[in-house]
């Protein structure tokens, strides 16, 4: 699920959302909002998560792509952003998207991963070019791109910080000049690397829970040395974890153990 949250956070950030990966994880996993974040950007993340979950459900069920199923995904992803109804006159583009996806999913992916990636990038281009969902078309384009990648067992493409400027520039040029190959070629040069991690280093809280699950007797100083933060910082994180019901102390401070809940 954290991998999915990484996709949501990266895509929402391109739409102006300021939640970082840890804040996004807290919101989507635990329902905990972060101070200073607007309701609209938090709703955007939650709706986008629901859209991704719907797409993953269709992918696991091996459901054929159709305008109806795409609309079902969009209705969830854009629930608080105007709804998932496609713009008037975009039905031919939706049918072409479905045809592209269904052609790829009918054949074994082995030995054809590059071809499938190219098809997913073309789907992205078509959504963006035809502005099927208005100003949020690019966000939906990334979702549909990832949907096909999910279904075909490929590593989902995420637009990383280092390529955001080029991504926007190339996408803008491709759509204005109506030359999809410009964008598809650019994206093909940035296909997801299975050896790359989608998410940054786990948070200190995640590391604490992992360590205590394996070694429940570890002390605050032990945790601090292992994680690389101060003992005071560990104590603060332990307090937060206990308040959230993720952790509890069994027995006395000296001689007791931690229990991960």
Regions found by a protein language model. Name each.
Residues 1-261:
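FIC/Doc superfamily catalytic core
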